[in-house]
Amino acid sequence: MSKVTFKITLTSDPRLPYKVLCVPENTPFTAVLKFAAEEFKVPAATSAIITNDGIGLNPAQTAGNVFLKHGSELRLIPRDRVGSC
């Protein structure tokens, strides 16, 4: 089974920390999003992953498809403060 590697950067932190994740290519991307959010200690339910160009990703696909379409460098955006007063 082939694996794909993602470098996921946390955009909400000014230091821009990142994690490198290596997962089987048939892994649901929702699992990658959930794991990355847990690693950064942000809520997965209110987080999104985008490309470096700012394009949002639909998590309802495999990690292999995301890798082929968008490459390995992605950004995690916690949306916990969006719309709050």
UniProtKB/Swiss-Prot annotation:
GO terms for cellular component: cytoplasm; nucleus. There is a cross-link at K69 (Glycyl lysine isopeptide (Lys-Gly) (interchain with G-Cter in UFM1)). One of its GO terms (biological process) is response to endoplasmic reticulum stress. The keyword Iron does not apply. Gene3D superfamilies: Phosphatidylinositol 3-kinase Catalytic Subunit, Chain A, domain 1. Residues 84-85 form a propeptide. It holds the Pfam family Ufm1. Belongs to the UFM1 family. Interacts with uba5. Interacts with ufc1. Ubiquitin-like modifier which can be covalently attached via an isopeptide bond to lysine residues of substrate proteins as a monomer or a lysine-linked polymer. The so-called ufmylation, requires the ufm1-activating E1 enzyme uba5, the ufm1-conjugating E2 enzyme ufc1, and the ufm1-ligase E3 enzyme ufl1. Ufmylation is involved in various processes, such as ribosome recycling, response to DNA damage, transcription or reticulophagy (also called ER-phagy) induced in response to endoplasmic reticulum stress. This is Ubiquitin-fold modifier 1.
